Amino acid sequence: YSTQEFISEDMIKEIAAVDGIAGYDASLIVHEDFFNEDGEALKTERYGFYSYGSYNSEYNAMFLSGRFELVEGSHITEDMENGLIISRDLADWNGLEIGDTLTGIYYPESKTPAVDMEIVGIFDIVADKDDAVNLYDNASYFDYSNYTFCSMEAAEGLLEGWGDENEGI
């Protein structure tokens, strides 16, 4: 169920304080472009990136469901400023590893800011198209290899200025 309302940070803190709550995550979806330290666009499987701005990525449904498994580094936590988790495929295609910095830009043709993010984790895709338990999401045209998770602060930074006067398509 969704009211399409944004959940404020105060609401998140109030929910997290409820006795019995072990952890939480809230997501902000961003479709940015990524560039390596030489300014080159990253190689991807198809289309673009599907990024979750995250407070605590270990509680994201993609990890909780078993579709993804963190295999290197750490999850995004609420105290990280510009952390980034990428897929093993994306790391291999682009020669990336933990500690490398990528630059994300939400809409390169506009005035949205570039945000530098450090790779803090790498995940494997466990989901299998033939496995009903970890069903691959055929409803999305984004390939799981192109999913990323960035700290909420980074996601909000990517959207800074979006929708202001003279912005947009």
Protein language model regions, located:
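Basic-flanked hydrophobic alpha-helices used for secretion and membrane insertion
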Residues: Y1-I169
